[in-house]
Regions:
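Membrane-proximal, proline-rich intrinsically disordered regions
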Residues: 1-55, 82
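Structured, solvent-exposed acidic/aromatic patches
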Residues: 17-18, 56-111, 115-288
């Protein structure tokens, strides 16, 4: 009853990965926010600000800001409150549709681990292994358990993707949902191994033996880690305009940081002239 005779059925969508693929697309922004407000609040005002790439020049509300270590109270939860639904709304549906099997599910695991590490970088311990999607409250994983669980999930995903890539399996039905590498799943293996290496570096002081093991596994892997600029991950998702361009030029709310201009200028790095425009005042030059 009340069924479109010309539309696809749920069975049709499962067969060509349309249902799981569309959910994968919804998870990718958790790694790099393309929507303008989410990008500004998370990637720019937290990641790029504290990473020494940009600084905010606008003031909001009480005049607080991340660069003064005094953001508005309501901003403290932004990374958690925005990213967790982006991960798990799609993840649990993919797990249900795939019964926790197949490449789409393992792809979702890679995205889940990458996004969870971003959240943990901000807050420390977070819910991970105990999340069910049906409970109002969830126990947090300790930092030790969190990283062990993320390593386990990532290792399983790497093994599944690597087996398929090396066997030359047809993964074309997933290509159209890939906003990062356009269906080049060898690059997704490199991404996952590089993520594994980054995680190992994160825990190198707290768990040096585990860090050494995981770092060596990532580098020694048959497909390996990112080693060339062509391996770089770039999300093509946005809401009509590059959000960094929008905030810098349409909204006039950010400028380049003195940190990055000092380092790039000090080392005569050729990327400086690509990243930064010459100052229009005080004799020009690259001024952060």
């Amino acid at each position: 009853y009340n069924t479109n005779p010309y539309g696809p059925t749920q069975e049709d969508m499962i067969g060509d990965n349309a249902s799981t693929g569309s959910l994968i697309r919804s998870m990718i922004p958790a790694l790099a926010q393309g929507q303008q407000n989410n990008s500004q609040m998370l990637d720019q005002m937290i990641g790029s600000e504290f990473g020494g790439q940009i600084t905010c020049i606008a003031t909001w509300g009480n005049g607080g800001n991340y660069y003064t270590y005094n953001p508005r109270i309501g901003w403290y939860g932004n990374m958690f409150d925005t990213t967790m639904p982006q991960i798990y709304t799609g993840f649990f549906q993919i797990r249900k549709l795939s019964e926790g099997k197949g490449l789409a599910y393992q792809w979702a695991q890679i995205l889940r681990v990458a996004a969870s590490m971003r959240i943990s970088d901000c807050y420390g311990a977070i819910p991970y292994s105990q999340i069910t999607g049906s409970a109002f409250t969830t126990a947090y994983d300790s930092m030790e358990d969190l990283y062990k669980n993320m390593f386990n999930d990532l290792d399983a995903a790497i093994a599944a993707f690597e087996t398929a890539v090396l066997a030359g399996d047809d993964m074309s039905s997933l290509k159209e949902y890939d906003l990062v590498f356009d269906g080049d799943f060898r690059k997704w293996v490199k991404f996952a191994n590089t993520l594994k290496l980054r995680m190992a570096i994160r825990i190198s002081n707290a768990a040096p033996e585990l860090a050494k093991q995981k770092a060596e596994e990532a580098v020694a892997d048959v497909i390996g880690v990112m080693t060339d600029a062509s391996d770089a991950a770039y999300s093509s998702y946005n809401d009509g305009m590059n959000p960094y361009y929008r905030v810098a030029y349409a909204w006039n709310e950010i400028r380049v940081s003195a940190n990055i201009t000092s380092y790039l200028g000090g080392y005569n790095d050729p990327r400086l002239s690509v990243y930064v425009d010459n100052a229009s005042l005080d004799g020009g030059g690259y001024v952060g």
